[in-house]
């Protein structure tokens, strides 16, 4: 078998060419009915248009506020996760987690939660840690260091 002998198992369906003469059955108005806004190119009203009455998005008042663009999203890891992936005496930081392909960068930092058990002495350098996780790390003789989240520094204004 050669490349030029290949053919699809199901033949390609020919597309319907509309507006190509009355004998095709799809000539003249090309399936768009008689005249009017919808028969024109780009015609028709927007999906949210309600015929001129006051639309729902303007009838309903605005409520609350959103702080979503300033929200910090942390990559959450557990003590059980650290126990599985790190050896005794190792350092846990954003760099070591990324180098071991355990997390993806692109979030605002790493947060450790106290789920599971920790049986190893670790040096933990993360952005946030829960009280129970901190207590568990220090109970095994490890240390906890909070690292600042790297962000944009504000430009000093000229006075």
Swiss-Prot record:
A GO BP entry: translation
Annotated keywords: Ribonucleoprotein, Ribosomal protein, RNA-binding, rRNA-binding
Any one GO molecular-function label of the UniProt entry: structural constituent of ribosome
Pfam families registered for this protein in UniProt: Ribosomal_L27A (PF00828)
Keyword Membrane among record annotations: no
SUPFAM superfamilies in UniProt: Ribosomal proteins L15p and L18e (SSF52080)
Region (Disordered): 1-46
Bias type Gly residues, positions: 22-34
Gene Ontology, cellular component aspect: cytosolic large ribosomal subunit
Summary of subunit composition and partner proteins: Part of the 50S ribosomal subunit.
Function: Binds to the 23S rRNA.
PANTHER family xref list: 50S RIBOSOMAL PROTEIN L15, LARGE RIBOSOMAL SUBUNIT PROTEIN UL15M
Family: Belongs to the universal ribosomal protein uL15 family.
Official protein name in the record: Large ribosomal subunit protein uL15
